[in-house]
């Protein structure tokens, strides 16, 4: 019989399974350390129970830092919620060391409350809620210096101990790369009986230095059997507010996201411009989707494709 996992369990998928400091004294240690005896992470059953009313999960991935994953996550959430008022949306910030969503969603200074059903996520709109480790810190300047097992334990708590309620879509803002956080969240959320319930959206900028890492992220999803909804090319162009001319800040010398999507057989969802209004809205936590501009027009097409893919 499996025992409940210790607080900082590295997870059975981790190379530290059965070997970490948290494993000492755990009744499951012998099972986890033996590749021939490994059982399903006992924490997964708790996650499955907690997430049973969350219909769809969408990983926002990139591979490269600085391409705007967090910004795109907040923009998608805001636009989806505004254009689908009868649906409920959640955001989970699993960028443990660099949580950005509290600022982007205008929720700095908010706190998480405990109820009989677990942590209550912070309400952003009537149909949007948010959970981030940023709400658990004493100061926005506090550094989180954690190794993989502790990060994995935090992610497991977010998935199993937060009262998400009934959600039509949960968007997960992820850190760059294919790190412990990615392996952990995929192992908990992937449902072999319903593989379409967990999907991914890739975010890239046009230049090859970003596309190189996004290709790796696409291959990660293929190896993990995670369906990819498509790719969003962020900061694709810049339109001058004075003269109206459009220029490429990050030239697509190898064809940009268009060429990569054709090469790898992945849909291109659309392109978002480098927009000064986005920058201002990110710092202030303002909802940019209330403005009618080139960004909101691009979001309309992107969000329509996302909703169609999960319908």
From Swiss-Prot:
GO cellular component: cytosol
Keywords on record: 4Fe-4S, ATP-binding, Cytoplasm, Iron, Iron-sulfur, Metal-binding, Nucleotide-binding
Compartments, as annotated in UniProt: Cytoplasm
Example of a GO biological process term: iron-sulfur cluster assembly
Cofactor(s) this protein cannot do without: [4Fe-4S] cluster
InterPro entries registered for this protein in UniProt: Mrp/NBP35_ATP-bd, NUBP1/Nbp35, P-loop_NTPase, YlxH/NBP35
GO molecular function, one term: metal ion binding
CDD domains: Mrp_NBP35
Binding site for [4Fe-4S] cluster 2: 240, 243
Domain of life: Eukaryota
PANTHER family per record: CYTOSOLIC FE-S CLUSTER ASSEMBLY FACTOR NUBP1, NUCLEOTIDE-BINDING PROTEIN NBP35 YEAST -RELATED
Family: Belongs to the Mrp/NBP35 ATP-binding proteins family. NUBP1/NBP35 subfamily.
Function: Component of the cytosolic iron-sulfur (Fe/S) protein assembly (CIA) machinery. Required for maturation of extramitochondrial Fe-S proteins. The Nubp1-Nubp2 heterotetramer forms a Fe-S scaffold complex, mediating the de novo assembly of an Fe-S cluster and its transfer to target apoproteins.
Binding site for [4Fe-4S] cluster 1: 9, 23, 26, 32
Cofactor binding note: Binds 4 [4Fe-4S] clusters per heterotetramer. Contains two stable clusters in the N-termini of Nubp1 and two labile, bridging clusters between subunits of the Nubp1-Nubp2 heterotetramer.
The protein, known as: Cytosolic Fe-S cluster assembly factor Nubp1 homolog
Chain spans, region Disordered: 1-20
Assembly, per entry: Heterotetramer of 2 Nubp1 and 2 Nubp2 chains.
Protein residues bound to ATP: 63-70
